[in-house]
Amino acid sequence: MPVERMRMRPWLEEQINSNTIPGLKWLNKEKKIFQIPWMHAARHGWDVEKDAPLFRNWAIHTGKHQPGIDKPDPKTWKANFRCAMNSLPDIEEVKDRSIKKGNNAFRVYRMLPLSERPSKKGKKPKTEKEERVKHIKQEPVESSLGLSNGVSGFSPEYAVLTSAIKNEVDSTVNIIVVGQSHLDSNIEDQEIVTNPPDICQVVEVTTESDDQPVSMSELYPLQISPVSSYAESETTDSVASDEENAEGRPHWRKRSIEGKQYLSNMGTRNTYLLPSMATFVTSNKPDLQVTIKEDSCPMPYNSSWPPFTDLPLPAPVTPTPSSSRPDRETRASVIKKTSDITQARVKSC
């Protein structure tokens, strides 16, 4: 248990009346005005018996210092005493009469009577502006709960629900008000939306073309197109009958060009029907254009060559002396003539 001790104000009165501390005295006992020696000993060094007897007595009274056991610390004693004086609600400093410089520095204080003591030191009374701001903050809550005639007819449960919601409704949550059938339907629509509309159910896509003007009001729903007829035609045409395979085979014909015989399948290629343009260009796709181009190929790449054993080969043509050139000369004679020409040119030079 902490030891009960005398409070600071009666303790100070006792120290002043004892006249044991030099410089501590009453200036006006009727008005409870007194002075305390307040030397700045840090400048010239501490003299405990002269500069800090009051601070030492307060440290001993509060148990912060034990004579003969603790080392003297007048600087700490003075700081603790100043903090205790500033925390008292019934003692205030008379600053216009205090002298804080020089060798005879002191501070003057006054003990306040009971009638002048504030209820709690440090707490300022509320101003009119703070009261007005608080009143304005309470008005919107009261006005939202009141009816058009100024009389509030809402129950406390509904008031708590309304203040918690604050007109913020989630589109995925349905808010249900229980036990409020007596409320007006118009007020319910204004305060709470019990069934908010479900959104994001239909995705709309806009299309534009050269013929049609761009208009944001003309919206078309997004649809998945069915399988095109071109894909169906591919599946049906991929499986051909034996007759079609026979018709698709190339027919080889004999042809002779400049006395030489060749095998050719020109003019026997089958024509393949391609899907019409209506398959790709429809009224739903006004901007789509498809161009199909087929390169000419004299012979299919996947066809095989027929055997040549059944076909008669032409007899080899042997050259005859009549077919040779009459002015044909041997290689040796040509070399001899050229050598004679070069020698003649050298001599002429």
Curated annotation (Swiss-Prot):
Cross-link (Glycyl lysine isopeptide (Lys-Gly) (interchain with G-Cter in SUMO)): 137, 166, 293
Covalent crosslink: Glycyl lysine isopeptide (Lys-Gly) (interchain with G-Cter in SUMO2): 137, 260
Subcellular compartments: Nucleus
GO cellular component, one term: cytosol
InterPro entries: Interferon_reg_fac_CS, Interferon_reg_fact_DNA-bd_dom, IRF1/IRF2, WH-like_DNA-bd_sf, WH_DNA-bd_sf
Listed Polar residues bias regions: 230-239
Phosphoserine PTM positions: 225
Modified residues (N6-acetyllysine): 75, 78
Pfam (any one): IRF
PTM description: Acetylated by CBP/ p300 during cell-growth. Acetylation on Lys-75 is required for stimulation of H4 promoter activity.
The UniProt record lists the keyword DNA-binding: yes
Biological processes per GO annotation: defense response to virus; regulation of transcription by RNA polymerase II; toll-like receptor 3 signaling pathway
Chain residues forming the annotated DNA-binding region: 5-113
Any one GO molecular-function label of the UniProt entry: DNA-binding transcription factor activity
Keyword Transmembrane helix attributed: no
Keywords from the named record: Acetylation, Activator, DNA-binding, Isopeptide bond, Nucleus, Phosphoprotein, Repressor, Transcription, Transcription regulation, Ubl conjugation
SMART domains, per the entry: IRF (SM00348)
Subunit record text: Interacts with BRD7, IRF2BP1 and IRF2BP2. Interacts with CREBBP in growing cells; the interaction acetylates IRF2 and regulates IRF2-dependent H4 promoter activity.
Annotated family: Belongs to the IRF family.
Function per UniProt: Specifically binds to the upstream regulatory region of type I IFN and IFN-inducible MHC class I genes (the interferon consensus sequence (ICS)) and represses those genes. Also acts as an activator for several genes including H4 and IL7. Constitutively binds to the ISRE promoter to activate IL7. Involved in cell cycle regulation through binding the site II (HiNF-M) promoter region of H4 and activating transcription during cell growth. Antagonizes IRF1 transcriptional activation.
Name this protein carries in UniProt: Interferon regulatory factor 2
